[in-house]
Amino acid sequence: MFLAIIKFQNYGQQVLEAANYIGQGFAVTLDHLNRLPITVQYPYEKKLPSERFRGRIHFEFDKCIACEVCVRVCPINLPVVDWIFLKDVKKKKLKNYSIDFGVCIFCGNCVEYCPTNCLSMTEEYELSSYNRHELNFDQTALGRLPPPASEDVSIQLVLNSRNSFRR
């Protein structure tokens, strides 16, 4: 008889514990109802990248002195620098510069150590393609600047909708 009463008490305690845990979970759910969603509908809405974001590398052909510092500091020796030596002026002349973004790890060492600042990081992050050979950018493709992300219409829509929701 006492065993049955003890089992019934244990069962009652377990029911109260379960109800307490369910209540705690429900409180967390109610707390999150007032918050803004974290996700966006990506192709149609885009988030503004942070200031420290390291996107595609931009290259300025005229500033490059073909010193190959970018190749030496790259962990995977990725940038391909082709140059010829001009004997009359005793200087290197850059012929070709390319980076394969299918292999690049976007560490930013090349940008940081470039003595002439001919390399810079952009806000562009949409580099996907169906053919990996399309990710090999030469100096012409690297020289094209993408439109600033802050001027993108889909980002402006997200920022405006969030500001109107907070008011």
UniProtKB/Swiss-Prot annotation:
Record field: catalytic activity: a plastoquinone + NADH + (n+1) H(+)(in) = a plastoquinol + NAD(+) + n H(+)(out); a plastoquinone + NADPH + (n+1) H(+)(in) = a plastoquinol + NADP(+) + n H(+)(out)
Cofactor detail note: Binds 2 [4Fe-4S] clusters per subunit.
Binding site for [4Fe-4S] cluster 1: C64, C67, C70, C114
One Gene Ontology cellular component: chloroplast thylakoid membrane
Sites where the protein binds [4Fe-4S] cluster 2: C74, C104, C107, C110
Membrane topology: Peripheral membrane protein
Predominant subcellular localization, coarse grouping: plastid
Domain 4Fe-4S ferredoxin-type: 55-84, 95-124
Gene Ontology molecular-function annotations: 4 iron, 4 sulfur cluster binding; iron ion binding; NADH dehydrogenase (ubiquinone) activity; quinone binding
NCBIfam families on file: ndhI, NuoI, PRK05888.1-3
Subunit text: NDH is composed of at least 16 different subunits, 5 of which are encoded in the nucleus.
Function: NDH shuttles electrons from NAD(P)H:plastoquinone, via FMN and iron-sulfur (Fe-S) centers, to quinones in the photosynthetic chain and possibly in a chloroplast respiratory chain. The immediate electron acceptor for the enzyme in this species is believed to be plastoquinone. Couples the redox reaction to proton translocation, and thus conserves the redox energy in a proton gradient.
Protein name: NAD(P)H-quinone oxidoreductase subunit I, chloroplastic
Gene for this chain: ndhI
